[in-house]
Amino acid sequence: YMFGLYYSDNKKPNFTEDYVLYVRPETTVAQVIDSLQTGAGVLRPRSIERCFEKMEVSAKMKPGRYVIEPSFPSIYVARMLVFGWQTPQNLVLSGTMRNKGRIAKKISTQMMVDSASVAQALDSADFLKGYGFTPENVFALILPDTYQMYWTASVEDIFDRLKKEYDAFWTPERDA
């Protein structure tokens, strides 16, 4: 009996669907289990519950964007949540980038950050000075592209990445 449970929890695939699970800081384990059952098609709910208890998911769960595949056993999903094994998100910045409200909305609909904090950063001379920009010329920092980053990235992480790509693009040869 014990080996059967071990096998069921640790080796046997427990999902029927590919599913992207979003965990916010305020998300509860009950919400995660409910979300997995609805979206990922859990085959053995008790297996998920046992693994979540064993790994203390309720106390240790990390926010993030987790891609669940049908081949995953319950224990792997529990470990993903406890250790924060996120799958990167594609942040797509394209189209018209000349309106701060639109930029803030575009970022916040794809990432965990809210549009108010992005808008605040776009208008903060002190914050932007660290990147060599001002609220007036910040549009130049944002190159239309697809940026792979973690869904939980902070506003600072996002701007660090935008600046890194900006610096990589604007080489002295291109700048001339």
Give residue ranges: language-model regions:
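Conserved catalytic or metal-liganding residues and their short signature motifs at active sites
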Residues: 1-176
